[in-house]
């Protein structure tokens, strides 16, 4: 346990970090249930939490309000703890349309979803780490409070194999089928197995690149090895191995049979109710849909929408909370909630929205009443299941303020940077004044963020700035997570200088190049111009030594005054600390990395990483010779079932043919 977690960093805690770390550790050791880390933007809150995790030596779940921040945190913790199990648990849907019914137009919308296989693998890897390891750090979104397969059923479905043990091949293959692995005779992919005589190759669902080879001899496990499924190279011999199921929803056969019987009983009760109310169409619809699901479960062990029967599959009573990621956490775990002023209300709102949609489905005969128990946790259930918790925010919400037993303040930054200077200027000339400020900041080689109140205003401002020769982009709500991170990355790289948005430029975005934040119509009181929103938005310029914020307003609202007072209080404390310790503020030099590396696999990144070689200086004869050589390699790889290598060579082959045609 001595070095269970080890931080790799060139820096030591500085500024307010040592005090905050000591305060939080003391609170945890004293048994405090809830604490808050009130840390300003750029004060190194992630580094502080990393030191708390290292000191406490406990598995940790970190929750972020969205996939963007979760990916950023995942990258940072992965860098701090390269020797530990840092995992990523977010929704695996690239696209998700839930099942719904609109009575007004008699429209039923089928469930439609596109699952990201890479994220599904990372989710399985996360629960595996919690089961197998004491040094797990799981970075998650609110997806953590949604129903997941029952851990007891999941653990009963594991396949354990040891070298030298007696094991019949047919039993192993049957077990793999029960675990929902599919058999293949071609290239081995995640969640598949392949049989070649007495050799069974398995590509575990939780593994990204490595597969397992089981060699049998006379019904005895003769050898176990990890190997590369692409090249076939043996990487390591193993004394034993545990294969985890392909999905969290895998269920033992006897539980499936019990579920089917309970579903049949509920179906008869519900049909009697609907017929008594003369809802004949609803009764016929429910019977048809449920009988189809029952048949699928009996034949295949699962059905589309099997999560709607999760009450029976996990053997729970009506109304009981569903199993979630929290059920996989050990009792001594820590819970960290990042940007808690956003995440906590988000957790509280999930249950009600889900319930309203499902009640309509139940009332109109699309689902049995037990489907209502396939739901996210209610807020009180989340509180019951939460281990010791630390909330992190620059602007804690009312819940954290009321329930925290200890508040550790982290106002002084390790870099000595002070909060941005805030100016107030009139609304009447805001656009022209902003244009002049933008030109000055661009001349210094820095970037600008501008927030507006409406989508229309953001579009018009973007068009106006663009017409005047300014490189500007508009970040709107339709941009997906990956594209959004690419836009922010391009801003940092200087592909453009000004980013205009509405409510998308607040929490957690790490952009040290931004020297000016402009808030238009700052005196329009409301959600987008509340005290918390203003402090968070002003904070986007806090990572730059020349950081400034301009609020365009004709009146000073209550929210503005409170935000200005808090910013000034922090500035005074930071200046006093710098003066006392002789610190000169330094800007943050942070490399522009793809923070989604490991969390997403994008086409753009692949193209950059795998730029095909150019043969512009070759003669036609040399090109033709190279084309023939590549063609032979391509077919050789294809015959060896090394299709990925064959595809790479094919791309190069086509490129050369194209060049030859141009000569």
From Swiss-Prot:
Q: Name one Pfam family in it.
A: Helicase_C
Q: Which residues form the UVR domain?
A: 624-659
InterPro entries reported in the protein's UniProt record: Helicase/UvrB_N, Helicase_ATP-bd, Helicase_C-like, P-loop_NTPase, UVR_dom, UVR_dom_sf, UvrB, UvrB_inter
Q: Which SUPFAM superfamilies did the record assign?
A: C-terminal UvrC-binding domain of UvrB, P-loop containing nucleoside triphosphate hydrolases
Alphabetical GO CC annotations of the entry are: cytoplasm; excinuclease repair complex
Give the motif span (Beta-hairpin).
92-115
Keywords of the record: ATP-binding, Cytoplasm, DNA damage, DNA excision, DNA repair, Excision nuclease, Nucleotide-binding, SOS response
Q: Which residues form the Helicase ATP-binding domain?
A: 26-414
**GO molecular function terms attached to this record:** ATP binding; ATP hydrolysis activity; DNA binding; excinuclease ABC activity
Relate the assembly described in the record.
Forms a heterotetramer with UvrA during the search for lesions. Interacts with UvrC in an incision complex.
The domain-related comment in the record is: The beta-hairpin motif is involved in DNA binding.
Q: What is this protein called?
A: UvrABC system protein B
Lineage of source species: Bacteria, Pseudomonadati, Pseudomonadota, Gammaproteobacteria, Legionellales
